[in-house]
Amino acid sequence: SPTDEELSTVYSKDNCENIFNCLINEYVIINDENDNFCDVIRWNGVKYETVWNKTLKTLAFGDKIKSKDVYQRMAFDSLLNNTMTCITGHAGSGKSLISLVTAMHLIETGKYDKIVILFNPCPVKEASQMGYYQGSLIDKAMQSNIGNMLITKFGDRFAVDNYIAQGKIKLIPMTEC
């Protein structure tokens, strides 16, 4: 835990000293003496900034989406503020949903034109191999793990096909990179 003096420096108006020796866009989680979460800050190269618990609303996902824990808060913040973000976590921790909600928010607000998704063309269990059966790249992609994830997150295949037709989502198999 940071000392009272360190916290005083971080929260002062002139907090331009990198007291935790952070890299640019590195986060610091601040807990109290009982190890309860208090705050999360990010070093922007000039000063520490508080990472607010933002709420995103998109046409694609409807209801406002808000982080459920500090790690999701940092993921949302990084996706909104950085050109590249890698999110890790166990299954069900919200990585895909947070990424898609943030990407759709950035598209709907005009900051991005489209989402480009590189996917592994390995099919899900008992689905056809990418190159062996007839069908478009999109049809084959929808049988892969990425297709199942997109259909689950967007609600149905029609919604995914619609975003692809509008050019808002582009699927590229890694074999074509």
What is the predicted function of each stretch?
Residues 65-69, 93, 135-136:
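Conserved phosphate/pyrophosphate-binding and hydrolysis machinery centered on Walker-type P-loop NTPases
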Residues 165-177:
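Conserved RecA-like ASCE ATPase "motif II neighborhood" in helicase/translocase motors
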Residues 84:
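Walker A (P-loop) ATP-phosphate-binding motif of ABC ATPase nucleotide-binding domains
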Residues 90-91, 120:
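P-loop (Walker A) phosphate-binding loop of NTP-binding proteins
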Residues 97-166:
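Conserved P-loop
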Residues 2-73, 77, 87:
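Feature 3881 marks metal-assisted phosphotransfer/nuclease machinery
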